[in-house]
């Protein structure tokens, strides 16, 4: 069964919901998600220490910055809904699974702490369904295609990006059902249906990014030949910053999860953040204006890029010292 939203079925909210907010999941499910996420992150840190070259640190920062900027732009999907880039497949393919997961985690944590996008209690769940699950799905398919022709690899990466969104949506539906928030029989087809469309956008963006890298800086796709120099770092950050200029044009329609919550009647269970710093990607003293959104995006891009690169360098230095 496919649930297709119709215009006017659900009002656009003042606070667009891009990630799972507090209140959607039970405490028990949230704790389980935290335990799983922390266990996987512990493995990721250990493996990242063993495997990645320090020259990958700035690449991780640039990738995190681009994904953050990309996630700010919701694109319209079907009458009255929107979607946005997750970016996990892109991060895992370019950085490898371990450093890729750390980059995705940095993005998701910063979004929750600074921009109040995603709950604090359910942060572990957001890392699980936006970082771990989609990244492993997309990267798993990519591993199968390694060594094959460029065309096959590109097609498989696109398919993996699409599938990663659908699987992440299904896992989210399971978490909602097990939390008692809504019925599994309703949540699964509703989440899967709309995210099959959102996944097309994910696939197109991921393939475009990979193709651009392959044409302009192919060494980035070969982690054993990590590129050096500062020109590509400046260029990568410039692209991320340019993307933020388009953030005011993002679709105001609710994203897939928010639409499902409205249709299924549990949208009101979402809890507001206990504090606000740059809520909903705006600077409070500038209000909900285009300039406010752009400046908030610039702050986020620079912070997440710098933090991710710093974490990567710190991991490598600890390895060298041990």
Regions found by a protein language model. Give the residues of each.
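Short, strongly hydrophobic alpha-helical membrane anchors
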Residues: 1-24
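Individual transmembrane alpha-helix segments
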Residues: 17, 278-309
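Hydrophobic transmembrane alpha-helices
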Residues: 19-23, 31-90
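Alpha-helical membrane segments and adjacent membrane-interface helices in multi-pass membrane proteins
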Residues: 74-135
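Short helix-perturbing small/polar motifs within transmembrane alpha-helices
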Residues: 129-168, 172
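Glycine-rich ThDP/TPP pyrophosphate-binding loop and its adjacent helix/strand module
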Residues: 156, 174-231
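Juxtamembrane non-transmembrane "cap" segments at the membrane-aqueous interface
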Residues: 251-279
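Short, charged juxtamembrane terminal tails flanking transmembrane helices
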Residues: 317-322
């Amino acid at each position: 069964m496919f649930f297709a939203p119709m215009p006017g079925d659900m009002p656009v909210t003042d606070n667009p919901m891009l990630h799972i907010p507090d209140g959607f999941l039970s405490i028990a499910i949230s704790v389980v998600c935290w335990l799983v996420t922390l266990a996987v992150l512990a493995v990721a840190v250990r493996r990242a220490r063993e495997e990645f070259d320090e020259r990958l640190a700035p690449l991780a920062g640039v990738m995190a910055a681009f994904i953050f900027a990309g996630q700010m732009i919701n694109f319209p999907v079907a009458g009255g809904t929107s979607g946005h880039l997750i970016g996990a497949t892109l991060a895992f393919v370019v950085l490898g699974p371990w450093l890729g997961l750390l980059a995705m985690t940095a993005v998701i944590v910063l979004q929750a702490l600074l921009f109040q996008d995603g709950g604090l209690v359910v942060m572990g769940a957001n890392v699980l369904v936006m970082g771990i699950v989609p990244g492993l799905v997309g990267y798993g398919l990519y591993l199968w295609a390694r060594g094959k022709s460029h065309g096959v690899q590109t097609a498989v990466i696109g398919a993996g990006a699409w599938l990663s969104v659908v699987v992440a949506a299904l896992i989210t539906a399971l978490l909602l059902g097990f939390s008692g928030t809504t019925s599994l029989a309703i949540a699964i087809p509703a989440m899967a249906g709309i995210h099959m469309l959102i996944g097309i956008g994910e696939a197109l963006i991921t393939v475009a990014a990979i193709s651009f890298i392959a044409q302009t800086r192919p060494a980035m796709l070969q982690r054993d030949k990590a590129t050096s120099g500062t020109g590509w770092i400046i260029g990568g950050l410039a692209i991320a910053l340019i993307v933020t200029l388009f953030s005011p044009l993002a679709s105001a329609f609710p994203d897939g999860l928010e639409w499902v919550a409205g249709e299924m009647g549990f949208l009101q269970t979402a809890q507001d953040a206990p504090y606000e710093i740059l809520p909903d990607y705006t600077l409070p003293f500038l209000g909900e204006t285009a300039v406010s959104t752009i400046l908030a995006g610039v702050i986020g891009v620079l912070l997440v890029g710098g933090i991710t690169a710093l974490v990567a360098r710190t991991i490598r230095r600890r390895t060298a010292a041990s």
